[in-house]
Amino acid sequence: MKKRYFNMIPSPDTACILLYGEIGGFDGINDKDIVSELYEYASMYRSIDVRVNSPGGSVYAGMAIFNALRASDADITIYIDGIAASMASVIALCGKPVYMSQYARLMLHSPYGGCYGNKEEMKAVAEQLEALEDTLADMYASKTGK
């Protein structure tokens, strides 16, 4: 049986996707599976509700999910059930609209990572982190208008 990385709860016009867990990693939310299932659901449902409870995770896996949600023909509504931290907060930007309980949390931070290597390799990683930070700031600014 295929492992499902999130649950889909159908209704006549709306699919509800539960995006719970860490994005990326061995046991986390797999972007390839999510994106392929999202495209499948978008072809069957006019609206997709995405319920988020995630500490975040891989920036690049999250970007793939973000881009798929943004490109979807379905109307995407995001509900933050518990926490949308780190990359999950970026995925939450896809909602038109976004709903959040007064008890839920939205948490942001600059991207981070590590590396081993010589000074040129370390400098390249620092430059990549700066570029990612600029990209993420643009994404937040686009949603908030600030």
Predicted regions and their residues:
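Terminal-region recognition feature
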Residues: 1-146
